[in-house]
Structure formats: C-alpha cells, structure tokens
Amino acid sequence: MSDLDNKEVLIALLRKRSALDILKTEGWYHIPVDTAPKPWPPTAIAFYQGTVFGKEEQYKIRYFGEVDQIDIVPRKELFPDDEENAHKAEIFYYRVQLSELHQRYKPIISYRPRRLVFIPTTWAKFQLAEQINDLFDGSPLEDRLWSALKYISVLAERQWKIFVQGHKYYLDFAVFCKHGKLAIETDGYTTHYDSLNQIDYDTWRQNEIGLDGWQFLHYTSKHVKDDWTPYLSQIQRAIDQLGGTEEPEKFRRKVGEEQGKYIVDGEEPL
C-alpha cells in the first residue's frame, strides 16, 4: 500500500459471497451513484462481511484495497446476465477498481451483529483497529470517551442505529445490559447549545428514545473537557444498576432466537 495516512478509507458491506468472488477475480466493487456515501471518493475500501459468510467469517473485516480507478457505468454493464434484476439495468453505479486486494493478518471484528452499509474512517484508524467500534471517526469527545470505556472494559457499541415510532436515530454509544439498555450521548457545546431549535430537537429525541426503554447519560465538551475520569464512575454505576453488561454471545443468541421481531441496527432482521 502507498502512504495513506490521514486519507479516507470506506468500510463497505459485502452482502453476497459473489461480491467477494468478483473482488478476488476481477478486483472491483460496485456502489449505486445515488446512494454513495460522503465524503467521496475514498482512497481505499475495506469490506465488512455479512451473515452470508457463516459463523466463522460473518461480522468481520478481512479484505481491503487501495482504489485505483472509479468509473460510472449502468448496472447492465456490470451484470449483463442478471435477468432477475433486469428492472435495475439502467441504474448507474460506481465501479470501484482496486489496485490489489489485500488481507489483514488479523481481521477487525464486530462483537455484536450489525447490519451496516458504510463507515467512513481514516487509514490511521483502520490500521490500528481491533474491533469495528475503533473505526468510527466522530468528534474528538466521542473518541476520548471510547478510549475511556475500553480502559474500564465496557463493551459499548458506537453509532448504534435504532427505530422509535417510525423515526431513525443514531446513539453515540449503546451499552446493552442484563436488565436494560443504556445510551451515552456526547456533543460539543457550540453545536448543541447555541441553537434553540437544536435544544428542542435534542429534548424531543431524548424523550422518544427514553420512552422506548433506554436510560440516558448525556455529556458535553463543556462538562468533560479533556478528562473523562470523574464521569467513568457515574457510567459504571448506571451499568451496575442495570445488572452489568450483557455478554455479546448472549446478545447474538437472542437475535438468533427472535429473527422475526428483533431488529438489530437496521431496517430488517439480520
């Protein structure tokens, strides 16, 4: 790989085994032009393997490559024999050609099932990541809290997507406990407190999520500054009151037993 420090890396979903076969044999990946993530284009792409890859390989990021060339082509050029999706034949896609497909010596894992599509990150974070939550490139406040939570061995999930009353929300941090769910939210003072409209939205959002059974802890950069230490005991106390964290394997079994109704980080069951 060339020098990619501070460059954009895109984590993308491999929905089918055939997508990996194409990467290995032809070296390209396709993304609909209308739904391509921002920022665009990425310098490199890494691939999150969905449930179709089976127990040993699902929820892992193993393959990656540097982007060599990007073309815009209709779907019929990518898949000329795909009669099942003939109605999509004229839709335009980015064909992202990689210079070479690489494998990480140790894959990045997701402890809990996540149905994600894209995660923009940096090459520096991708190199150091051990689990998927290490990849999120949020605010400096979120990154500091994530480091602090790992230090006290709290298995939180970053940017966890939930649906409440038909609305989609992303939680900065979700902690699944034996007797409840804890949401930990962070924001910058200037972002959320200089606007009355933002205050109104945040209040409504927190009330909606709270009525869905989530307990809330909310911190701002004005409160925390550079040191999370005084707040970690409060977070740990909230977790203890909810029975402690639920082990990821138990969470996975719960999802498996309730496929029809247990929606995990997405619009549909995994």
Question: Locations of the language-model features?
Answer:
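Structured alpha/beta reader/binder surfaces that contact nucleic acids or chromatin modification marks
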Residues: M1-L135, S139, D143-Q159, F163-H167, ...
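Hydrophobic transmembrane alpha-helix bundles
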Residues: Y93-L101, Y193-R205, R253-E268
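Composition-driven recognition of long, C-terminal low-complexity regions enriched in serine/threonine
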Residues: R144, S153, E157, T203-N207, ...
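Acidic-and-aromatic substrate-binding clefts and catalytic sites of carbohydrate-active enzymes
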Residues: F163-K168, V224-W228
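Basic, amphipathic alpha-helical patches used to engage nucleic acids or provide basic targeting signals
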Residues: C177-L242
